[in-house]
């Protein structure tokens, strides 16, 4: 049954009623059920749903249910994000406004609570409780109040911001609202100083931006390629950068700068100058806080260039102030290290060069800046001429003039000018860096003037540092600037350049220099000598260089005249190359545009598919949520019913009174039932303990009371016994008197009624006479009816008993019949089982007998094969000797130059035959005759003549020796019938002697080439491929004089084919149509007459149809024919289709 759902209007009205009676949770549940219902999604407009949504969010804010508010907002977004975006925006802004108002109210309440606490007792401000709390937790009263009152609302407001950002991040119509909420979240973090939330917010926004960049062409409607989206993201990141700087989160500020640079690089439109100026200003501030003076000065220089070029209304004072800032920041850059390769030995994630390159990219520089390059750029931009006289002197003293004795005094005057001038407050952070650079300049200049100097003298020259700072700077100069300095603490002196074997690198430091160090002079003396000698040669031979130049000029002119024509043609050809290149580039551009169009089309198609998939996933997600909501609603309903049921009992009310509404919602029905049972058990235990204690108490009091009551009871019983005796005596006396009076009244009444006896007797006699006749008449009627009913019941009883006896007889008869049938069925089943068992035993006996016969036959055949092999070897030897003798005779009588004999009509020549003069050869087991190319085989008749091969006798069917039909498909007779057959049927050879019956055939001495050629052609009857394979496997001679192909016996050495397994017969069984054709051919063969089984010993191979038969064929008996028909009708495995091997 479907669950009852309310309409939105009714739900809103009912929620207001719940709010009025002080049940906001019930009101929120009522509205939530409406939102969970899917029926209203597209059935009502925003004018109906929007007030309900505001009330829903108001209740969520009041109860601090941010997760329930998130669910409702997502449902509202899915409904109205494509219909009415303004309604969605109003709802979200209203929700955040309510959350902010409650948070501000909580903050005011917390401050008021602290004020009340502080003004509670003016005479005793530091109470013991406040002192202990401050010592334990280190917090003041305001912090504790904020944690208890303000912090829950701050958390709720933070969750609200995160939910709204997650809600609007993929909606292209709400981009402006998304960025406004992001700025509101930044203001929230600034107002309440939430640094951890600010970091999480930055990560969240960065993740959203990455998702937009990755999936701009897939599932989201927000595209980073749009100019409006890029500008909104850029403004948000700039606001993020300002907020991070205000909160002093420099790491987040740097990440924001990276995001801003990426967005500016992605944008096709150049950012406005105001944005770039703000970017460089914030970047310079971040670098300054990071302590990177080099990139700080580079950022200020970029800002100065941008302001100078694009700001038209820049005043002279502003320009002078900016120039002084840039110049002082550049001069404050520490002197570069002479050993930058030392950083390679420090393990870090990235090398300093990679980091510098990354920072240079943020400034738009092709390569990382250096102090020297920045000073050159400052001079190129004429910055020293734009600043005041003091700062211009500062540049000259540090970078131009060489005056180490007065350097620190001069710089101190500039430092005093910066510190005393209120307009120079922006330059104060550079004072310490400027002093360090001045000390390093002083040390370098002193090292070029003095070989050694006293420590006190150097301290006098470096007036703004003490001995420890000076020693530290000396060590740093040796470590980083590759200077030769040795400190002698014993003599309190400093030595410069004492080791002449060491010198500086080829890299020379910037700044003013008077002369080279002694070690540098020794290192470069060869270079100086080369320079001097070159100058001397030019003075001694002033015309040599001029003559060399004239000669070189003439060579160049002559070479030009040689190649000017080729060069002219090359220049003309270059124009054609340029045109071809332009055409090629144009084609490439067209192809690229087409490819881009195809790619965009493919991307749009993929985007549509992805959008469709997303919609399907959202639909599935909505269905899943709907299902979950329904399950949750059912659970809540059952929970409510369970709570209502429990609340009707006293212990249930007591248990529910201990839980609030939140606790009840967190429990399910089982947990509530469990708590109810626990409450019952606890109450039972408490009652039992109370009863036990009460029992002890009552027992004590009762025993004490009984002890005290015993004398009182004894006195009372004695008095009561006396009173009872007196009362009994009085009562007994009264009773006796009353009995006597009653007796006297009864006797008087009896005497008075005795005179009425005669009248009574007369009345009874008259009544008996009157009623006697009526009684007799009724008695007669009753007896008649009784007799009729007795007869009727007797007749019915006779009929019923007769029918029962008949039914019992029929039932007994039917049971007897069924019993007999069951006995017959059981007897038949027993007979069938016995017959089946007998047949099985008979088959097993036959199989065993057949197996023994097969083994015996196999042994005989193996013996016969052995004998045949011996005969074959003997015959081969005889043939070999005969062939040698014949060859000798032919060599003796061969005519000189005569032609060879021509081939016979049969296609077999004398050269091929190479046989003895006698053309007849007999072999065991059959007869084979070859004569002039004709080939006749008897015993399964086979004739070949002149390249033609004919097989007769039912397609190469062979006659059996046992007198039966020799067809290769015969009925399998039992062993008893085969045993009963006559042993000698007039056949010339028995089955044991004829080893080829059912096994291998006779050895064939056939011609190799002729037979192979004949076998390749079509056959008249059927394919003889398997037979040729069998002939080849028998290992017979291909020619009369040729060697045997193989001497291995056949894998199956013959034997009775009836002994073979039946499954092979069934596999080789041919279709019925082929069997019918074979039967027809056998019938035709029988009509023509059986072929002779053995040819005459001197027969010449005449017509085989006219050849006389050597033995009579016994016709098949009628019984066998009938049995054969029966077997053909039902093929139960006794008929097989075995190929003779």
Swiss-Prot record:
The yes or no answer to whether the keyword RNA-binding is present is yes
| Keyword match Transport | no
GO BP: formation of cytoplasmic translation initiation complex; regulation of translational initiation; translation reinitiation
> What is any one of the record's Gene Ontology cellular component terms?
eukaryotic translation initiation factor 3 complex, eIF3e
- Tell me the segments the record calls region Disordered: 588-631, 829-1141
The cross-references to InterPro entries, in alphabetical order and at most eight, read: EIF3A, eIF3a_PCI_TPR-like, PCI_dom
Q: What is its main location?
A: cytoplasm
Chain positions with Phosphoserine modification: 908
| A GO molecular function held by the record | translation initiation factor activity
**Compartments (UniProt record):** Cytoplasm
Q: Which UniProt keywords apply?
A: Cytoplasm, Initiation factor, Phosphoprotein, Protein biosynthesis, RNA-binding
Biased composition (Basic and acidic residues) is annotated at: 588-623, 829-899, 920-976, 990-1051, 1059-1087, 1110-1131
Q: Which residues form the PCI domain?
A: 319-501
The UniProt entry's sequence similarity note says: Belongs to the eIF-3 subunit A family.
Provide the function of this protein.
RNA-binding component of the eukaryotic translation initiation factor 3 (eIF-3) complex, which is involved in protein synthesis of a specialized repertoire of mRNAs and, together with other initiation factors, stimulates binding of mRNA and methionyl-tRNAi to the 40S ribosome. The eIF-3 complex specifically targets and initiates translation of a subset of mRNAs involved in cell proliferation.
Q: Assembly state and interactors? A: Component of the eukaryotic translation initiation factor 3 (eIF-3) complex. The eIF-3 complex interacts with pix.
Q: Which PANTHER family match?
A: EUKARYOTIC TRANSLATION INITIATION FACTOR 3 SUBUNIT A, EUKARYOTIC TRANSLATION INITIATION FACTOR 3, THETA SUBUNIT
Protein name as annotated: Eukaryotic translation initiation factor 3 subunit A
Supply the source organism's classification.
Eukaryota, Metazoa, Ecdysozoa, Arthropoda, Hexapoda
Name the encoding gene, please. eIF3a
């Amino acid at each position: 049954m479907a669950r009852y759902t309310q309409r939105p209007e009714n739900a809103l009205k009912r929620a207001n009623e719940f709010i009025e009676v002080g049940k906001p949770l019930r009101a929120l549940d009522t509205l939530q059920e409406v939102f969970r219902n899917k029926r209203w999604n597209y059935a009502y407009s925003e004018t109906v749903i929007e007030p309900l949504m505001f009330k829903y969010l108001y209740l969520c804010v009041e109860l601090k249910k941010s997760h329930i508010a998130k669910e409702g907002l997502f449902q509202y977004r899915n409904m109205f994000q494509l219909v009415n975006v303004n309604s969605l925006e109003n709802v979200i802004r209203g929700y955040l406004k309510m959350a902010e108002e409650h948070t501000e109210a909580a903050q005011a309440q917390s401050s008021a609570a602290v004020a009340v606490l502080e003004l509670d007792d003016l005479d005793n401000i530091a109470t013991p409780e406040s002192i202990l709390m401050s010592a334990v937790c280190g917090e003041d009263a305001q912090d504790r109040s904020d944690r208890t009152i303000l912090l829950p609302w701050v958390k709720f407001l933070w969750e609200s911001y995160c939910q709204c950002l997650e809600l609007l991040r993929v909606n292209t119509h709400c981009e402006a609202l998304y960025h406004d909420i992001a700025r509101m979240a930044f203001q929230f973090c600034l107002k309440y100083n939430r640094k951890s939330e600010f970091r999480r917010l930055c990560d969240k926004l960065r993740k959203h931006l990455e998702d937009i960049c990755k999936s701009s062409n897939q599932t989201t409607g927000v595209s980073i390629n749009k100019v409006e989206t890029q500008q909104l993201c850029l403004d948000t990141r700039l606001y993020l950068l300002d907020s991070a700087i205000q909160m002093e989160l420099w790491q987040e500020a740097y990440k924001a700068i990276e995001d801003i640079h990426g967005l500016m690089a992605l944008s096709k439109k150049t950012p406005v100058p105001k944005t770039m100026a703000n970017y460089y200003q914030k970047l310079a501030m971040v670098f300054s806080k990071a302590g990177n003076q080099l990139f700080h000065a580079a950022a200020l220089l970029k800002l100065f260039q941008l302001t100078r070029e694009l700001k038209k209304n820049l005043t002279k004072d502003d320009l002078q102030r900016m120039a002084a800032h840039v110049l002082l920041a550049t001069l404050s850059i520490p002197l570069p290290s002479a050993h930058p390769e030392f950083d390679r030995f420090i393990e870090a994630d990235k090398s300093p060069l990679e980091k510098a390159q990354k920072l240079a990219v943020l400034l738009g520089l092709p390569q990382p800046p250096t102090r020297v390059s920045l000073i050159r750029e400052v001079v190129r931009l004429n910055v020293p001429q734009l600043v005041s006289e003091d700062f211009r002197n500062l540049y000259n003293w540090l970078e131009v003039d060489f005056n180490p004795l007065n350097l620190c005094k001069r710089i101190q005057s500039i430092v005093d000018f910066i510190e005393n001038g209120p307009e120079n407050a922006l330059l104060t952070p550079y004072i310490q860096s400027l002093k360090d650079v001045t000390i390093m300049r002083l040390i370098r200049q002193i090292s070029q003037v003095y070989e050694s100097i006293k420590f006190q003298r150097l301290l006098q020259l470096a007036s703004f540092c003490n001995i420890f700072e000076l020693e530290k700077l000396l060590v740093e100069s040796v470590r980083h600037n590759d200077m030769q300095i040795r400190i002698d603490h014993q003599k309190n002196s400093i030595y410069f350049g004492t080791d002449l074997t060491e010198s500086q690198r080829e890299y020379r430091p910037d700044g003013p220099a008077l002369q080279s160090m002694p070690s540098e002079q020794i290192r470069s003396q060869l270079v100086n000598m080369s320079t001097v000698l070159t100058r001397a040669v030019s003075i001694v031979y002033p015309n040599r260089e001029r003559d060399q130049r004239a000669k070189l000029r003439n060579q160049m002119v002559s070479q030009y005249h040689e190649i000017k024509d080729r060069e002219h043609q090359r220049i003309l050809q270059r124009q054609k190359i340029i045109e071809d290149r332009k055409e090629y580039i144009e084609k490439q551009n067209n192809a690229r545009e087409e490819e881009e169009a195809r790619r965009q089309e493919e991307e749009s198609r993929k985007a549509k598919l992805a959008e469709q998939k997303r919609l399907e996933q959202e639909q599935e997600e909505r269905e899943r949520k709907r299902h979950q909501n329904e399950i949750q609603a059912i659970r809540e309903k059952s929970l409510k019913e369970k709570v209502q049921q429990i609340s009707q009992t006293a212990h249930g009310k007591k248990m529910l009174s201990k839980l609030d509404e939140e606790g009840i919602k967190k429990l399910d029905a089982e947990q509530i039932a469990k708590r109810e049972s626990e409450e019952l058990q606890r109450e039972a235990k408490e009652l039992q303990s109370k009863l036990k204690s009460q029992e002890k108490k009552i027992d004590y009091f009762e025993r004490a009371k009984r002890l005290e009551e015993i004398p009182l009871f004894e006195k009372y019983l004695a008095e009561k016994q006396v009173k009872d005796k007196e009362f009994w005596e009085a009562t007994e006396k009264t009773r006796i008197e009353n009995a006597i009076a009653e007796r006297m009244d009864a006797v008087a009444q009896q005497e008075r009624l005795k005179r009425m006896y005669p009248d009574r007797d007369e009345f009874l006699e008259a009544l008996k006479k009157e009623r006697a006749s009526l009684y007799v008449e009724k008695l007669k009627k009753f007896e008649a009816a009784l007799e009729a009913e007795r007869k009727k019941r007797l007749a019915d009883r006779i009929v019923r008993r007769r029918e029962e006896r008949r039914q019992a007889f029929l039932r007994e008869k039917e049971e007897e019949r069924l019993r007999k049938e069951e006995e017959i069925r059981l007897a038949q089943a027993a007979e069938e089982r016995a017959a089946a068992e007998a047949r099985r035993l008979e088959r097993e006996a036959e199989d065993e007998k057949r197996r023994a016969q097969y083994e015996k036959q196999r042994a005989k055949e193996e013996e016969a094969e052995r004998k045949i092999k011996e005969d074959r070897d003997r015959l081969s030897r005889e043939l070999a000797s005969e062939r040698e003798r014949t060859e000798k005779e032919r060599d003796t009588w061969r005519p000189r130059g005569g032609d060879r004999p021509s081939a016979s009509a049969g296609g077999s020549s004398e050269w091929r035959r190479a046989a003895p003069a006698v053309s007849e050869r007999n072999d065991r087991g059959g007869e084979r005759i070859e004569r002039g190319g004709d080939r006749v085989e008897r015993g399964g008749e086979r004739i070949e003549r002149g390249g033609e091969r004919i097989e007769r006798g039912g397609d190469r069917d062979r006659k059996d020796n046992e007198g039966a039909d020799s067809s290769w498909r015969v009925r399998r007779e039992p062993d008893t019938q085969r045993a009963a057959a006559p042993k000698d049927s007039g056949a010339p050879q028995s089955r044991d002697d004829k080893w080829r019956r059912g096994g291998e055939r006779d050895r064939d001495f056939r011609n190799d080439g002729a037979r192979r050629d004949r076998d390749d052609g079509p056959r008249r009857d059927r394919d003889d491929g398997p037979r040729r394979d069998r002939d080849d496997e028998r290992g017979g001679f291909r020619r009369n004089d040729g060697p045997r192909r193989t001497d291995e016996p056949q894998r199956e050495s013959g034997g009775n084919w009836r002994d073979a397994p039946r499954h092979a017969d069934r596999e080789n069984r041919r279709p019925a149509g082929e069997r019918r054709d074979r039967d027809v051919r056998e019938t035709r063969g029988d009509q023509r007459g059986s072929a002779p089984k053995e040819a005459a010993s001197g027969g010449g191979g005449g017509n085989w149809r006219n050849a006389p038969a050597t033995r009579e064929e016994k016709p098949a008996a009628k019984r066998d024919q009938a049995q054969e028909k029966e077997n053909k009708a039902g093929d139960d495995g006794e008929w097989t289709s075995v190929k003779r091997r």
